[in-house]
Amino acid sequence: MFSEVKKEIIEAGIMLDRYELVSLTCGNLSVRMPSGEILVTPSGMMYEKMVEDDMIVMDLDGNVIEGTRKPSSDTPAILHIFRGRPDINAVIHTHQPYATAISLIPGLTEFRVCITALANAAGGNVPITPYSAAGSIDMGIDTVKVTPHKEKI
C-alpha cells in the first residue's frame, strides 16, 4: 500500500540526516494521502535502515491500518495538525540545531527572515511555536494555533 510514497519518504529522511537536519532517530516525516490515510515514519529507527514495510499507515484517529512498528512518538501532534489543517498534506519535523536554539529564546514568536532566497522559500518571516515535550500533543496544538495560513514553522 502506497509503495512509491513510502520510498520517497524514506529518501527524504535520508536526505534530512545527510544535511544534519535530524540526527540518529530524532525527527519524523508524515504524509496525508489523497484517500485520507496518513503515512508516518516509525519511532526509534534510523532512516538509512528503514524499508517500506517499516512505515505505518493509519487513519486520522490514529488507528493503524498497516504496519507493525511503533509510530513516531509525535503521532498525536502530527494527527492534530492534519485534522486542524486540512490544507496540509505533509509534516516534516526536524531537529535543526539553530532552529531549536532559536525556539528556546523566551518570548520570541517569529523568526525574521532577512536572506532573499530564504525569504522566498519560507514565504516571509517564520512563526515559532513554544517548546513542547516530545510525544506531547502540545506541539500540534501550538502549530495549528500559530499557523492558520502559514505552511512553514
For the regions a language model picked out, list residue spans one by one:
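Glycine-rich flexible loops
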Residues: 1-153
